[in-house]
């Protein structure tokens, strides 16, 4: 399993977008991480379709979209259209996560799942064969700057 450097753009100033992305391009980043939120699954909002489109126009790096929202399947076509290469869903945010993951792949994008700190690996074991990426949250989702949760580290080790 490969380890990748995927800096988050959550706190990126759109005023300095081009400069910041250029710096990330030459910094050795593998993938740029974009958080999108609906204000319900988590009590916050992230980047828009237009933000992703603008980021895509300014980099050739892969873009991953972390969908912190209920029923993300409603929007995967749009995120794919606007430039996402990898689309992460939270399995508990979707009624039938297997269907959404398969739809992501049919769009030619890489499906991924997110494991929140309080979720056991056993609960997502069946989904691992359907995804190319796993995002293990070491903070509670929704806001930047939250405290690192050390108890999650064994989950990361178990995945490797």
Region locations from a protein language model:
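Conserved N-terminal beta1-alpha1 strand-loop-helix module at the mouth
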Residues: 1-88, 93-96, 103-111, 121-131, ...
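Short beta->alpha connector loops at strand-helix junctions that form conserved
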Residues: 90-92, 137-140
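Short gly/ser/thr-rich secondary-structure transition/capping motifs
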Residues: 114-118
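A short, flexible beta-alpha/helix-coil linker loop
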Residues: 38-39, 139-143
């Amino acid at each position: 399993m490969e380890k990748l450097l995927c800096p988050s753009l959550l706190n990126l100033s759109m005023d300095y977008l081009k400069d910041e992305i250029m710096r990330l391009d030459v910094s050795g980043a593998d993938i740029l991480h974009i958080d999108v939120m609906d204000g319900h699954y988590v009590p916050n909002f992230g980047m828009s379709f237009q933000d992703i489109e603008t980021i895509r126009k300014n980099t050739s790096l892969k873009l991953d979209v972390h969908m912190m929202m209920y029923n993300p399947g409603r929007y995967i076509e749009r995120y794919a259209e606007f430039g996402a290469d990898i689309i992460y869903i939270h399995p508990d945010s979707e009624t039938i996560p297997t269907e959404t993951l398969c739809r992501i792949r049919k769009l030619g994008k890489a499906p991924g799942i997110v494991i929140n700190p309080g979720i056991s690996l056993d609960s997502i074991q069946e989904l691992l064969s359907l995804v190319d990426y796993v995002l293990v949250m070491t903070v509670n989702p929704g806001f930047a700057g939250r405290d690192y949760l050390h108890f999650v580290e064994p989950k990361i080790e178990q995945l490797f």
